[in-house]
Structures are given as C-alpha cells and as structure tokens.
Amino acid sequence: MKVKEFMNNKKGATGVGTLIVFIAMVLVAAVAASVLINTSGFLQQKASSTGTESTEQVSTGLKMFQTSGKLNEPIIDRLTIYVTPSPGSKPVDLKNTKLLMNRWTFQPPPVSYSSTYFENNNKQIFDVTGSKAWNNGAILPEYNFGVIVIQDDDGSCTAESPVIGKGDMAVITINCTNLDLAPRTRLNGYLQSEIGFKTQFTYILPNAYDKTEDVVILQ
C-alpha cells in the first residue's frame, strides 16, 4: 500500500515538474519573440530613416538655369547665377549654401548676410544703385555673395532666413573682379546646399566680348 502511494506521489511530482518546465519554455519563447519583434521594428524604423535621408541627399539641391556677367572692359567683374530648387527637392537655405569658383569659396556669414547682401526687389539685376545685394554700389566683398529674390509667393525667402522652395527663384550675386574673367577664360565650380548634391558647372567665356552689350550670358 505504501509502495503504491509512493508511486502515485512520484508521478504527481513528475507531472508538476514537467508542467513547470513547459511553462518556463513558453515564457522563454515569449521573451525571445518579443525581442525579435522589437529588433525587427527597430531595424525597420532605422531602414526607413536611412532611406529618407538617402532620398533627401539624392533629390535635394539647386538647379542653375542661367549665369550672366556684367562687362567692365576688359573683364567681367560681376556675376549673377539664377537658381531654383531642383525637381523634388526640399526647400534650400541659401544662407548655408557654399559656392566654389576657380578655387574660391564664397559663403555669406549669417550676420552680414542678413543686413547687407539681401534684396527683395525684382528690378534690374545689375543695377547696383541702392541694391543691398550689390552692397549699395560699393564693391561686394570677394568672399561673400548676395541674394536677389525673383519669385517667392509664400514669403519664405527673407533676409534672416533666405529659404527657397518649390516654384521660388533667386539670383546669387558675386563680385568676381579678382577672378580675371577675360575672354576665353575657363570658369568652373559648384554650388553645395547644406543637404543634398553638388550642382557643378563649367563655362568657357567667349573668344571676344561684344562691346555693344554690357551683359554676357555664359554658356
């Protein structure tokens, strides 16, 4: 009788032990699944974020659609570059945009830029009289560029924050006296927005300047 009772108790203990092991296995599996789900979610979020950043890098930037020079015999001493965001681009802050030309880097400091080199007045582009973008007729510092707003329907392009978005258009003004842009000069460089791609350009100036025209369209 005692042997039978002992065997029944042993079977009961074994059953409880098996149940405990089973519950432990279920808990471990649940924890592992939770970790996998969380890791998967993190990786998916990371991939999505990386994809968005990559898209911005590829699509964001400036499109140049005309570059003109003001002739002051025997050289071109002022340049204008018409820019707009490229198709699909996010808004571009011109304050944080760099322009490299023939080994020169032009970058407007935020303070002097906001007070001196901004013009929200669509008039004659090369009219320096009273134009802040041309330093009010004085020589524009060689290592700064100005901005003239051409089109800005939403008012996003201001002196303090010269941001251009879809449909906006602006002109970058440059003093290039010391670049010695005589006929047949090769002019190359790039525009680099804070985020996005470089807009590279190369121009070969005409063999001779037409003295009857004071504005030269670079090609």
Swiss-Prot record:
Principal location listed in the UniProt entry: other
UniProt keyword annotations, A-Z: Archaeal flagellum, Glycoprotein
GO process terms (BP): archaeal or bacterial-type flagellum-dependent cell motility
Cell compartment(s), UniProt: Archaeal flagellum
Post-translation changes: N-linked glycans consist of the 779 Da trisaccharide beta-ManNAc(Thr)-(1-4)-beta-GlcNAc3NAcA-(1-3)-beta-GlcNAc.
Propeptide boundaries: 1-12
InterPro entries linked to this entry: Flagellin/pilin_N_arc (IPR013373), Flagellin_arc (IPR002774)
Glycosylation site positions: N38, N175
Job description of the protein: Flagellin is the subunit protein which polymerizes to form the filaments of archaeal flagella.
Family label: Belongs to the archaeal flagellin family.
Full protein name: Flagellin A
Organism: Methanococcus voltae
Gene label: flaA
